Amino acid sequence: FGFFECINDQKVANALFDTAKKWLKEKGVSAVRGPANPSVNDEYGLLIEGFDKPPVILMPYNPPYYATLIENAGFKKVKDLYAYYLHQTTVYSDKLERVAEIVKNREGMSFRSLNMKKFDDELKIIEKLYNEAWQYNWGAVKMTEDEFKALAADLKPIVVPELVLIAEVNKQPIGFALSLPDINIALKYNKKGRLLPGLIRLLFHKKKIDGVRIIVLGVLKEYQKSGAAGVLFLETAQRAKKLGYNWGEASWVLEDNVMMNRSADLMNAKKDKTYRLYQC
């Protein structure tokens, strides 16, 4: 289930869920999981911790009472997702940079930014990496070529090429990281949502964007225990710093993704928000 909107009334919530469950049962569905808006590749999970922090780009937000409504409707926790906060003043350490250098030299890793002049070709590389590297993750749903193209078209206007990194070994792509400026910082100044003068106001406040969201970061399965993901994490932070970004949110990370949680810990990242997936 997804796109859940409800007043703080259990009877109303129950009516919504009962109707949805009945319809799904008629379609042969035996389990209901969510919120997914509309899938794991989009806005995912219910915010249960971190209500005092504003949502970053493409992350959901909801009233605190939603958890009670969902749980009282018979849903149980199936998985938690973490959002990590990183700041340029605390990310780096001699140990981290030393380990990163060892991994890069051992694996022969190099990094390059997205080539906007070959956007379609780059998109095919990233699509292949995404579907191969993420297929083993819990709840993974393969993205189709059309879905990837549609998402890329939506994001292209705000993409900063230097923040889209492709990791290579022997000139062969083995992983990538996609980070986007947190344009929510600027969007909040366009309260009426109008194109004009909202667009002018948005462009003016765009200068105030000092943070990014690390949306996806991963490597092919054969490199997932090599430390390559951690190196990609560090490389992203270093390039963001050169562009003047002071902080970042890495979201989201599965609670039992040991390697990614360990990488976040090595970079002194702070668990800032928790999102929950429910199932019944």
At which residue positions do the language-model features occur?
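Short, well-ordered beta-strand micro-motif
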Residues: 83-87, 166-168, 178, 277-279
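Short loop segments at secondary-structure junctions
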Residues: 87-91, 170-171, 222
